Amino acid sequence: MQATKSATFSREEQLRQLGELRERTTHVDLNDARIRDVAGIAPASFATGWIRPFQDTDEHYGKPQIGLADLDQLQLALVAASQIWLIWQRDETGRAIPLTMTVEGTKFVGSATLGACHARAIRRGQNILDAGVLAGFTMKDVEDHYRDEATGRVPVQLLDERLANFRELGSVLQREFDGHFVNVLRRADGYLFKPDGNGFIQLLERLFPRSFGDWPLAKLPYVFTFSLLDLRESRHFPEEIDRLLRFKDLQNLEGGADYYRPWFFLRVGVLTIDDELKSRLRKHQLIEAGSSLENDYRAATIEAMRRLARAMGGDYVAALRLLERETHAQALLRCRRCRVGISDEELPCPYRGVCKATHVDHELMDCVFPLVLTSEY
């Protein structure tokens, strides 16, 4: 959703508008009992480290694709965050599947595909870390960036929007931040939201509206924040950068309202969907961007993440960070492989005992993740 011209991008405005979206919801509801079930399973599931082996599968899940110096790694994080959306394609039958490509001789499935393309560009001398290069990007640059080596084609969708995002990053970085993302962090000074409108989430929404504009849901800004928190913990940044990444108001985090989280939630029964939405998902039909169907499952996903984090107890921010990883991975790595009657030996899953699609409504197992042609998630 694009913000209105009168948007202030304050946290208070965001909470009010998110509440209004939930009040208007008609296609999706939340199941409190199933929320308690999932909240009781998620911490132990995540603690097993089950996600880690998928670094070595075609998903390459969570595996860094290139190692760079500190400032370059931050710059790449911005570029990657502006492109990590619409990561699916249609197969030869018209059914939706995760984006699948061969990059530098390796097969990739899902979100790691885009990261592999960014790394390939850098290794081949296309300096996507330079704001001037980004500002001058052409359609040929985008097509070369996302070309599948196995087919010679470009399976990534909405190339015009991807080109616009590359160019916006470059021009705004040059105009406002001396070409460097670290200066965005310096202006935010360790806050997601500030009274003067210069918090990190606010800067992304306000100054990069093509790349990050999605108000009040702010999926890409929030997912970018989660990735920066993980990046900070995975390496030893200089003191200044480390301080800038220690956001002081993490209580203002929200879960990412994308398509994988609601897919897991509807499969397991955290979300209850009506027949109209279920029919579209079973038929792999597009949902109109900005429609009530889209707004309903996205707003409900944010509320579900809040309730799950509270139900887990303890540190709310730590719970939300765990859920952000667990729910996305569960959908891509497990739900995608699941079917009615699959054995625990073939696909271990701690949520199977409470899974609505498995035990109550088998039609939910036919549902694909929500399909929207959008650059917001």
Give the residues covered by each predicted segment.
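Phosphate/adenylate-binding glycine loop and adjacent helical scaffold
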Residues: M1-A218, L229, E233, T272, ...
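Residue-level detector of well-ordered alpha-helical segments, enriched
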Residues: N165, L217-L220, A257-Y260, A318
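Hydrophobic/aromatic-lined pockets within catalytic cores
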Residues: Q174, F226-E233, F265-I273, R306-A309, ...
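Short charge-dense sequence patches
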Residues: Q202-F208, D249-A257
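Secondary-structure capping and boundary motifs in well-ordered enzyme cores
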Residues: G213, L217, L253-A257, L293, ...
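Alpha-helical phosphate/pyrophosphate-handling elements in metalloenzyme active cores
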Residues: P221, T225
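Short acidic alpha-helical/loop segments enriched in Asp/Glu that coordinate divalent cations
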Residues: L231-L253, V270-R280
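C-terminal structured domains
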Residues: F247, D258-W263, R267-V268, K278-Y377
